[in-house]
């Protein structure tokens, strides 16, 4: 049993982001197709089930890595990321926002169904938005880690300390993934950082972009809820 757990952890730990996204997308697509076959009377539910499974499986696989990594492991893993990983971060954030927008559109159909089906649609919609919120800010947490541990600037010149840094974490110079998630979710909830200092221009710009995206996300959720109330 322990060997099986070790192999499973090794597999999850060594999953590249693209492969992880491909696996989770495949699971979501299969779930959507099966749900449509079984629940053809509500294609909205089929879409939501596929979207929820995609987000949930992605967060679970990524969560295993995040919770298990200490400072050195975080630095080692981040240093192996490809420079083009920024494109995947942008794609992940875009998909979270797009998915939330689609959920908002689906909520307009609540009033067209029976009470039981409407409750099911509302429950799945809330779950999908919640998972998209977690996915959005987890992606920013990963991006902060990549920027912090990046060894060279945009011109290919190595940093004096061997890494960019840009954040000053109390008590450690080798933060873990959880430390970067702390930054991301603190910004998401309060739009401020109390004990972590921002010490580089690039990090300040990234924090600004993160805050604006977060505000846009909340605005879309609010608009979707109001639209659902008006149309139901």
Task: Give residue spans per PLM region.
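The first (N-terminal) embedded transmembrane alpha-helix
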Residues: 14-38
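Hydrophobic alpha-helical transmembrane segments of multi-pass integral membrane proteins
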Residues: 26-29, 89-105, 182-186, 221
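Loop-to-helix transition at the N-terminal end of transmembrane alpha-helices
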Residues: 42-60
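Juxtamembrane helix-capping/reentrant segments at transmembrane boundaries
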Residues: 74-94
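Alpha-helical transmembrane segments and their membrane-interface junctions
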Residues: 95-116, 185-201
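Transmembrane alpha-helix/helix-exit interface in multi-pass inner-membrane proteins
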Residues: 129-156
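Membrane-proximal soluble regions of multi-pass membrane proteins
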Residues: 148-150, 154-197
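Pore domain of cation channels
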Residues: 179-186, 194-232
């Amino acid at each position: 049993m322990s060997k099986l757990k070790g192999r499973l952890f090794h597999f999850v730990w060594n999953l590249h982001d693209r492969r992880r996204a491909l696996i989770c997308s495949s699971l979501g697509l299969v779930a959507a197709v099966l749900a449509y076959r079984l629940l053809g009377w509500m294609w909205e539910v089929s879409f939501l089930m596929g979207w929820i499974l995609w987000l949930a499986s992605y967060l679970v696989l990524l969560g295993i890595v995040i919770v298990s990594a200490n400072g050195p492991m975080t630095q080692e893993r981040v240093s192996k990321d490809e420079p083009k990983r920024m494109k995947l971060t942008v794609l992940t954030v875009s998909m979270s926002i797009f998915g939330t927008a689609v959920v908002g559109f689906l909520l307009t159909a609540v009033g067209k169904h029976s009470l039981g089906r409407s409750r099911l649609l509302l429950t799945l919609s809330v779950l999908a938005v919640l998972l998209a919120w977690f996915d959005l800010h987890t992606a920013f947490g990963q991006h902060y880690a990549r920027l912090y541990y990046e060894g060279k600037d945009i011109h290919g010149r190595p940093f004096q300390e061997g890494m960019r840094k840009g954040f000053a974490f109390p008590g450690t110079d080798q933060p873990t993934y959880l430390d970067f998630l702390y930054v991301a979710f603190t910004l998401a909830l309060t739009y401020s950082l109390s004990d972590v200092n921002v010490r580089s221009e690039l990090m300040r710009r990234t924090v600004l972009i993160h805050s604006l995206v977060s505000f846009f996300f909340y605005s879309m959720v609010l608009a979707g809820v109001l639209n659902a109330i008006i149309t139901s």
